[in-house]
């Protein structure tokens, strides 16, 4: 930038159109005196020569010598269909953070529907854990309210399955998401997460319903790729 805050390219544009400005001004003054060029009055020729030069200088100032697009001007051009960029679906999915799901924004409802559909479509074997039929996300203010995630007919079967691996004595001392579980072998299971905001795509939701327990109705998920039904599954 020059000390006078004029871009050198803008000065070049002014130098090129100065000829049109001079002749346009001269023709305009002469036309005001009534002079004509044949049958054409000079008052009509002067502005026609001068105005394009003024527009070129104004455009050069707004674009800093034709080097950048004006930010606040010509906004109507950006609204045209040819200037609109389509949003990529993958980018939109990546923008959905766990905080959006926790606050009720984004795809929390869609996630619940998908989990319910997976629970109905996938067949169940005799040794598999029942799939979830619906998913609800209770907020911290609704500690006493928790809807059933397992069909009513499967609750007893799920409780018996969890009792085999989580005795009632140990369930009083540890939470399902607690990292300290000395009764289990930690080498064969992944580290539990501190908080779960969403259910993974390929997972099975398991709920425990125990009476006289501080963790009466807690839910967790089992990743199918990490679970082994023939040996032991850590919940």
From Swiss-Prot:
It is a multi-pass membrane protein. The keyword Membrane applies. Keywords: Membrane, Transmembrane, Transmembrane helix. One of its GO terms (biological process) is angiogenesis. The chain crosses the membrane at residues 12-32, 40-60. It is found in: Membrane. The keyword Nucleotidyltransferase does not apply. Residues 99-146 are annotated as: Disordered. InterPro entries: TMEM215. GO terms for cellular component: membrane. This is Transmembrane protein 215. It comes from Mus musculus (Mouse). The gene is Tmem215.
